[in-house]
Regions:
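Structured alpha-helical subdomains that flank or immediately precede key functional sites
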Residues: 1-207
Length: 207
């Protein structure tokens, strides 16, 4: 991925030495928050720029940015997600449900990874601070594991229904979080609409 190699998206991911370092940095990101304050990811804002290449010209399947509400997982603002958990006791058991985004190639890979707990746990680096609204995920890109921190704001319609992917278990958050982190790694959700299953599996497993 040339743009990643040249650092075009360098502010959107981190080349940490290990998962432990990523968790330390995650704690630093929320360390200054006071009281009930929640993490807000300024590098991938809750706005049209995180949805599309051009927020004023969404693709044909796209939802106008002004109609999107960014709802928090931890705030129980998402339809059906009344008792949110990152991964249920049966990881991947509920399956992956595609939304409006044309990223089936990635979701197919994600569904396969989600059916194997040892693979899923590899990319889900941290949900320890989910109550502060932050998660950390990693993907294998351009020969390295790239770490991505995201907040828990998910693009939804005004009824709280996620526009994009989610788990078939509405309380399970990992699918929404991982898709958002993957979109951030590539600059926006629209950017992950093209790809193949083999590429998606490598991104999620390193193999």
């Amino acid at each position: 991925m040339a743009s990643l190699d040249t650092g075009a998206y360098k502010d959107l991911y981190h080349d940490y030495a290990s998962d432990d370092q990523a968790r330390i940095e995650e704690r630093k990101l929320v360390g200054g928050l006071e009281g009930d304050a929640l993490y807000v990811d300024a590098t991938f804002p809750a706005s049209g720029s995180s949805l599309y290449y051009n927020e004023h010209q969404p693709p044909k399947y796209g939802i106008p940015a002004e109609l999107v509400e960014w709802n928090r997982i931890g705030g129980r603002e998402i339809e059906g997600c009344v008792e949110p958990v990152f991964v249920s006791e049966a990881p991947g058991g509920g399956g992956v449900k595609q939304g409006a985004l044309r990223d089936r190639w990635f979701l197919s890979a994600l569904g396969m990874v989600g059916s194997k707990p040892e693979l899923l746990s590899q990319i889900l680096v941290s949900s320890a601070l989910w109550k502060k609204g932050i998660y950390t995920v990693k993907f294998f890109k351009a020969g390295k594991w790239r770490y991505v921190h995201v907040d828990d704001k998910i693009p939804c319609d005004r009824g709280g229904r996620p526009h994009f992917a989610r788990s078939c278990d509405a309380n399970e958050a990992w699918v929404m979080v991982v898709e958002k982190a993957f979109a951030k790694l590539h600059s926006c959700y629209e950017a992950i609409c093209a790809g193949g299953l083999e590429e998606g599996l490598k991104d999620c497993t390193g193999a």
